[in-house]
Amino acid sequence: MGRIQRNKIKVEIKKLSHGKDLPLPCYATMQSAGMDLYAALGNSIVLNPLERLLIPTGIVIVIPNGFEGQIRPRSGLAAKYGITVLNSPGTIDSDYRGEVKVCLINLSNQPYEIKRGDRIAQILIAPVFRVIWDDAERLCTEETERSAGGFGSSGR
């Protein structure tokens, strides 16, 4: 399973047959938080405006207990082409053992072609804290600057 070493964690990964020739997820720079995921498509596909598709990555990962995988958009795809991860961030639970797939949506008014090997999203491995609910009759209602305000209450 996973082993933590100085802000690093080992995660088991297996390339599926349709992803054998693709790179493993990797960091673009030394300070990148996320690792790029690649489209493991047989043929190019077109993502039409307002269409969503589940894109295979050709990998299976074993995330250690106490961690999760987060699938996030690539900023360049979102800013330049309106392509983003629909359920962002997508969560990969530590007990999931299927292929990592990315649900992309095209929010632009132009079709977008996705080719085999395109970098389509990024994955982060992050710690997860288990919540223990404290069912309280009375909550701490100490006044705060925000109080019960939400949904735009702090200004534009």
Swiss-Prot record:
Q: Which GO terms describe its biological process?
A: dUMP biosynthetic process; dUTP catabolic process
- The answer to whether keyword Ribosomal protein applies is no
Question: Record keywords: Hydrolase included?
Answer: yes
Query: What reaction gets catalysed by this protein?
Result: dUTP + H2O = dUMP + diphosphate + H(+)
Q: Required cofactors, per record?
A: Mg(2+)
Q: What is its EC number?
A: 3.6.1.23
Q: Which domain of life is it from?
A: Bacteria
Q: Which keywords, in A-to-Z order, does the entry hold? A: Hydrolase, Magnesium, Metal-binding, Nucleotide metabolism
Tell me the NCBIfam families matching this sequence: dut, PRK00601.1
Functional note: This enzyme is involved in nucleotide metabolism: it produces dUMP, the immediate precursor of thymidine nucleotides and it decreases the intracellular concentration of dUTP so that uracil cannot be incorporated into DNA.
Family statement drawn from the similarity comment of this UniProt entry: Belongs to the dUTPase family.
What is the official name of this protein in its record? Deoxyuridine 5'-triphosphate nucleotidohydrolase
